[in-house]
């Protein structure tokens, strides 16, 4: 499959002590091939039931292309959780901490009773996903499903234990000796 093959070839860089893999789905570089994006979207469509979903939710920035593609396939609108405040009525700020950064995220466009699917590019430490889940619960949304394209580390387990929500992923990886390894 294109996703797994492309992951095996992607470069790994250091961000402090964190080994960061650079991939089109997670970083938008070097080039996002339509065939790769299509494969990822079709694989998500096979494992997530969108039939009772009002909104697709993703975090800025690298979930945007995934949410856009899924929105086009399903005709379901999507909401982007942003890294800056717009000060709109009902905006929900939430603190996010990842393996290499921390800061505020801002949720707009979600109202009580919305049925949502969360889509993201990668789950690694679980920090972003926990923040998103907590914000959506505060907004009164019903989380129908959660899917991340790439699973790395213990983030999925941490999120599931802390929130009770199951996380679906397409591929599990690790970084060993400066290379991505499919598990």
Curated annotation (Swiss-Prot):
Pfam families, A to Z: Pribosyltran
Record carries keyword Cytoplasm: yes
Catalytic activity: IMP + diphosphate = hypoxanthine + 5-phospho-alpha-D-ribose 1-diphosphate; GMP + diphosphate = guanine + 5-phospho-alpha-D-ribose 1-diphosphate
Root EC class: transferase
Pathway per the UniProt entry: Purine metabolism; IMP biosynthesis via salvage pathway; IMP from hypoxanthine: step 1/1
Keywords: Cytoplasm, Glycosyltransferase, Purine salvage, Transferase
Gene Ontology BP terms: IMP salvage; purine ribonucleoside salvage
Domain of life from the UniProt record: Archaea
EC number: 2.4.2.8
A GO cellular component entry from the record: cytoplasm
HAMAP family: Hypx_phosphoribosyltr
PANTHER family: HYPOXANTHINE/GUANINE PHOSPHORIBOSYLTRANSFERASE, XANTHINE PHOSPHORIBOSYLTRANSFERASE
Family: Belongs to the purine/pyrimidine phosphoribosyltransferase family. Archaeal HPRT subfamily.
Subunit structure: Homodimer.
Protein name: Hypoxanthine/guanine phosphoribosyltransferase
Encoding gene, per UniProt annotation: hpt
């Amino acid at each position: 499959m294109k996703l797994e093959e492309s992951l095996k070839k992607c470069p790994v860089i250091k961000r402090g002590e964190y080994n960061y893999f650079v991939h089109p789905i997670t970083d938008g570089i070097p080039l996002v091939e339509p065939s790769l994006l299509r494969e990822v979207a079709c694989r998500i469509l096979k494992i997530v039931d969108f039939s009772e979903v009002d909104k697709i939710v993703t975090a800025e920035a690298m979930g945007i292309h995934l949410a856009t593609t899924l929105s086009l396939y399903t005709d379901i609108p999507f909401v982007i959780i942003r890294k800056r405040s717009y000060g709109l009525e009902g905006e929900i700020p939430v603190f996010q901490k990842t393996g290499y950064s921390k800061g505020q995220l801002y949720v707009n466009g979600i109202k009580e009773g919305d049925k949502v699917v969360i889509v993201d590019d990668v789950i690694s430490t679980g920090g972003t996903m926990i923040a998103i889940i907590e914000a959506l619960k505060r907004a009164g949304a019903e989380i129908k499903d959660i899917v991340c394209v790439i699973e790395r580390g213990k983030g999925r387990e941490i999120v599931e234990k802390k929130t009770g929500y199951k996380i679906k992923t397409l591929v599990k990886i690790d970084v060993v000796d400066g290379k991505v390894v499919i598990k």
